[in-house]
Amino acid sequence: MEAALLLAKLPEAYQIFDPLVDVLPVIPVFFLLLAFVWQAAVGFR
């Protein structure tokens, strides 16, 4: 019974992380840009 009560409260607990979840899909794009900038810095060796 306690586990079901805990699961019911989880969405409320995750509301704090909503902005973080909105940002998460963008992170791979930043890695792609970082790789491009790094290659530009070393002169595309």
Curated annotation (Swiss-Prot):
GO terms for biological process: photosynthesis. Its main location: membrane. The chain crosses the membrane at residues 24-44. It is found in: Cellular thylakoid membrane. Pfam families: PsbK. Keywords: Membrane, Photosynthesis, Photosystem II, Reaction center, Thylakoid, Transmembrane, Transmembrane helix. The keyword Transcription does not apply. Residues 1-8 form a propeptide. InterPro entries: PSII_PsbK, PSII_PsbK_sf. GO terms for cellular component: photosystem II reaction center; plasma membrane-derived thylakoid membrane. It is a single-pass membrane protein. The keyword Transmembrane applies. One of the components of the core complex of photosystem II (PSII). PSII is a light-driven water:plastoquinone oxidoreductase that uses light energy to abstract electrons from H(2)O, generating O(2) and a proton gradient subsequently used for ATP formation. It consists of a core antenna complex that captures photons, and an electron transfer chain that converts photonic excitation into a charge separation. PSII is composed of 1 copy each of membrane proteins PsbA, PsbB, PsbC, PsbD, PsbE, PsbF, PsbH, PsbI, PsbJ, PsbK, PsbL, PsbM, PsbT, PsbX, PsbY, PsbZ, Psb30/Ycf12, peripheral proteins PsbO, CyanoQ (PsbQ), PsbU, PsbV and a large number of cofactors. It forms dimeric complexes. NCBIfam families: PRK02553.1. Belongs to the PsbK family. This is Photosystem II reaction center protein K. It comes from Synechococcus elongatus (strain ATCC 33912 / PCC 7942 / FACHB-805) (Anacystis nidulans R2).
